[in-house]
Regions:
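Glycine-rich phosphate/pyrophosphate-handling loop used in enzymes and phosphotransfer proteins
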Residues: 1-149
Length: 149
């Protein structure tokens, strides 16, 4: 009996979501293509083709050199390469200025899956978010790097 109720509930929710997609189509946060049912925030093409930094496990990478002498850092890396007017900028703007916390969490999960397969990371145990200035936190309502981490 429980299985039948669950089936009908899922079917009903699927129909409701399909109807809502006609009125409010879900779009990729990077390229604005329509999303398939199994895609959440990014289409599969963007999920695999957003430009990665490739800094993982690389000593004295560009990001570490930026921090050198300013703050004590054991290692630094980044997930994506930012280019003005690029798809990464569009994604980051949706997170920062449109409050898309779910998108930040999705990117964090993507990065976590990629990091899990990296043997060269050694003793990496956590990702630490960059603190956000209280004024910016009040403006945006959340720390986007914390949602990512």
């Amino acid at each position: 009996m429980y299985a039948q109720i669950t089936y009908f509930y899922r079917r009903k929710m699927s129909l409701i979501n399909d109807f809502l997609s006609l009125i409010y189509p879900r779009q990729c946060s990077a390229c604005n293509r329509l999303l398939y049912a199994h895609e959440t925030h990014l289409c599969n093409l963007c999920a695999v083709s957003l430009p990665r930094s490739g800094f993982e496990g690389q000593r004295n990478n560009e990001l570490e050199l930026i921090f050198a002498g300013r703050v004590p850092v054991e290692a630094a890396t980044s997930f994506l390469l930012f280019e003005k007017t690029g798809r990464v900028q569009q994604v980051l703007h949706k997170i920062k200025y449109h409050g898309d916390k779910d998108l930040a969490q999705e990117l964090g999960k993507m990065y976590g899956r990629e990091l899990a397969g990296q043997a060269s990371l050694g003793e990496l145990h956590m990702i630490i978010p960059v603190p956000l200035h209280p004024k910016k936190l009040k403006e945006r309502g959340f720390n986007q790097s914390e949602a990512f981490a």
